[in-house]
C-alpha cells in the first residue's frame, strides 16, 4: 500500500518533536504550532511545562469567504499577537513548529507576518 503525503508529514513532525524534547534549552521555550487543512489555517501556542495549548487562532473565526489562502493565513498573525499580549507572552522566546509542513506558502506567510509583529523565533 502506498503511503500518503500526510503520513510522511506526521513522521517528520514526530521526529522534530523528539529533537525538541531532547534539547534542554528548547524545553524552556513556548512553541508556536500551525496546522493547515484545505479550507482553513490554524495556529496555537503550546506551553511546554503544562503540556497544553494556551491559546489558538484560526480562520474559522473570520468571515471573509475562502480562508485557505496566503492572505488569510497572514491575517491571523495580528490576532495571535493580540492574544499573546493579553497573556503577557509577547516578550518570550518561541520555537516555530511547522508540524512537518514545508516552510512555503501559507506557513511562510504566517511566520513572516508574526515576525513583523515583533515575535522572535
From Swiss-Prot:
Keyword DNA repair: no
Xref: SUPFAM superfamilies: Translational machinery components
Superkingdom assignment: Bacteria
GO biological process: translation
GO cellular component, one term: ribosome
GO molecular function terms noted in the UniProt entry: rRNA binding; structural constituent of ribosome
Pfam family for this entry, one: Ribosomal_L18p
Keywords: Ribonucleoprotein, Ribosomal protein, RNA-binding, rRNA-binding
Gene3D superfamilies, sorted: 3.30.420.100
Subunit organization: Part of the 50S ribosomal subunit; part of the 5S rRNA/L5/L18/L25 subcomplex. Contacts the 5S and 23S rRNAs.
Family per record: Belongs to the universal ribosomal protein uL18 family.
Protein function: This is one of the proteins that bind and probably mediate the attachment of the 5S RNA into the large ribosomal subunit, where it forms part of the central protuberance.
Listed name of the protein: Large ribosomal subunit protein uL18
UniProt source species: Mesomycoplasma hyopneumoniae (strain 7448)
